[in-house]
């Protein structure tokens, strides 16, 4: 095997790091696109971070701060507490107080034990989706994968894009910032193309 000496090797370009400011994704996308020579903009346009974020869920859902008229909120039955208050009913109450017509879909495990991203769960969410209805996920990576894939299928079938916001209740799960979903079919997990959220909180 022929080996190249140091003089024959192509010089490596110096790597330039890019700081990611979650509050300014537009600048990050523009810088990455400039460096790579192609558009790298993703559908995820907003990331909101804050200890009291849930005090105003409308701000997380709507960039302009106006409450959507009709909204579907998808969650599971797992109780999440903040300051001894149940988070999911608190968010629903805040959305309703802002004038939003909020339909809550609570996913339940078919075997009574653990929720999985299955075609049946995806279909449960899919049948509630309609044009011009905002969709919000409040929960874990599994609920997020179920919902974003239901939205993905709806958009492919109808050609209509829906607003999708994820309010995460787990610290670090790929589902929140991935354009893929892990779907369990016949007991086998498969990673399939799906959809990024528009906003993450």
Residue map of PLM features:
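Short beta-strand/turn micro-motifs composed of small residues
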Residues: 74-75, 139, 168
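ATP/NTP phosphate-donor binding region
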Residues: 2-134
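Short Gly/Thr/Asp-enriched flexible loops that form oxyanion-binding sites at enzyme active sites
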Residues: 87-92, 143-161
